[in-house]
Regions:
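Conserved structural elements of the adenylate-forming
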Residues: 40-43, 54, 59, 73-94, ...
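Conserved pre-ATP/AMP-binding loop-to-beta segment of ANL
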Residues: 9-13, 18, 24, 28-31, ...
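Short hydrophobic/charged patches on amphipathic alpha-helices used for structural packing
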Residues: 46-49, 134-138, 157, 165
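Conserved AMP-binding/adenylation subdomain of ANL enzymes
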Residues: 81-98, 108-148, 162
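Conserved S/T- and glycine-rich ATP-binding loop of Class I adenylate-forming
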Residues: 57, 63-66, 99, 105, ...
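Short beta-strand->loop structural element characteristic of the AMP-binding/adenylate-forming
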Residues: 1, 71-74, 101, 124-131, ...
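Short, flexible, glycine-rich and Lys/Arg-enriched loop motifs at helix boundaries
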Residues: 1-12, 196, 221-226
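Gly/Ser/Thr-rich phosphate-binding loop
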Residues: 35, 123, 143-151, 160-226
Length: 226
């Protein structure tokens, strides 16, 4: 029956909610789940919504601790939503895009610039692997025809230097974000020539900024990107 999931390899997974109107064995349908709430619960939701403000804290994101002990940065709804929205706008992201997100979701790169960026623009999220591995990332870009790819410089270097890189078709890529540290000039040249990422943008920021403070333009000159 719907929602009665029994997975031998994932015994602890009990519920899967699928989008769309179709029904699948072992899965809940999203529209049906939306109808499960009672009138009293919807009334309670209205009360809670009335008490919330855009500047209320939504997340305490810990910094990396490169200049001292990690600090808990308190981020607001307005902060991370605007950050994600404007990153997507700068990438010209739309519902036609498929963003590959190999960066960790517990970090502001994956959480804000990845998942929330997709949600705010209707783009598809592609999560290639549990922990970064260049081959699953390249495979996902090829199989899912990803149009965008995020990563820090060392991730992109690992992908480009993978022995099997030439066997993957990454021609669907057009944009993405490189951040976390300065992008070397030679790496930017390789991203443009070998991964078709002429539209990649460089982001600079800090956790406290949620995380992007400034970034280059999609069609900016090469010198501006590095």
């Amino acid at each position: 029956c719907a929602g009665a999931l029994v997975a031998e390899k994932l015994p602890h997974l009990k519920h899967v909610i699928r989008m769309g109107s179709e029904k699948s064995a072992g899965m809940h349908n999203f529209s049906a789940v939306c109808q499960l709430g009672s009138a009293a619960e919807f009334s309670q939701l209205d009360v809670i919504e009335g008490q919330l403000h855009a500047n209320d804290p939504i997340n305490i994101q810990f910094t990396s601790g490169t200049t001292g002990n990690p600090k808990g940065a308190t981020l607001s709804h307005r902060n991370i939503l605007n950050n994600a929205y404007f990153v997507g706008q700068n990438m010209h992201l739309s519902a036609a895009d498929r963003l590959c997100i190999p960066v960790p979701l517990y970090h502001c790169f994956g959480m804000v610039m990845g998942t929330l960026c997709c949600v705010s623009h209707g783009a598809t999220m592609v999560l290639p692997c549990e922990a970064f591995d260049p081959q699953p990332v390249l495979q996902a870009v090829q199989d899912e025809q990803c149009t965008a790819l995020h990563g820090v410089p060392t991730m992109f270097i690992a992908e480009l230097d993978d022995p099997n890189f030439a066997h993957y078709d990454v021609s669907s890529l057009r944009t993405g974000v490189i951040a976390g540290s300065t992008c070397p000039r030679e790496l930017m040249k390789r991203l443009i020539s070998d991964m078709d990422l002429a539209g990649i943008v460089t982001a600079y920021g800090q956790t406290e900024g949620g995380p992007v403070d400034t970034m280059t333009e999609l069609d900016g000159a090469f010198e501006a990107q590095v």
